[in-house]
């Protein structure tokens, strides 16, 4: 489906490791993101395991794909949220590739920049030794804008995915885990994603992260 709806372009896809675990930290702008991100990871010889908002499992076609691929739904605000994080820890411990959208939902920033993100990504990143790779993707919202219910497959758009270098978290792993530390690591990772997104868009990234009444910063 991804190839039909839009052309794909990947920059530095070789940074996906051929073997072993990896945590791919990505921005989230459209319900189409998992489709493109799954194709991107598969095209580099790996099987992605998604941590994504559970409501995606109710989206026609998308839900069937996610269920069939045995992906990991995240139930925000319930005891099941911790179970989802545990499943992601197990996937990384077993040498798998996990894709996470730390914003927890499609960004509410009017211009599509990342929102303040949830700290579960920091826990995953700090507790495993595999590479933590920031990844930005842009173009899916131009095809399907979920908040405004706009579907514009034509003319065909280009969806670009750009990978950064693995983030060195060794200094953080030596420190006691605190809420402040988790927040710093989360903002560091999403800052890298934001800068990659700025490169794709050819624009200056805004300072900080978008927040709104619906954006909850503390969690998981």
Question: What does each model-found stretch correspond to?
Answer:
Residues 86-91, 159-195, 199:
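A charged, well-structured terminal subsegment
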Residues 91-121:
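Catalytic-site beta-strand/loop segments enriched in glycine and acidic/polar residues
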Residues 201-220:
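Short, highly charged C-terminal tails/helix-capping segments
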Residues 111-179, 212:
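A cross-family acyltransferase "interaction/gating" segment
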Residues 1-28:
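Helix-to-loop junction immediately C-terminal to a conserved catalytic motif
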Residues 21-23, 97-101, 133:
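Residue-level preference for the first positions of well-ordered beta-strands
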Residues 18-78:
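Catalytic core of membrane glycerolipid acyltransferases/transacylases, capturing the structured
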Residues 40, 65, 90, 123-127:
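Hydrophobic/aromatic ligand-binding patch that stacks against planar heteroaromatic rings
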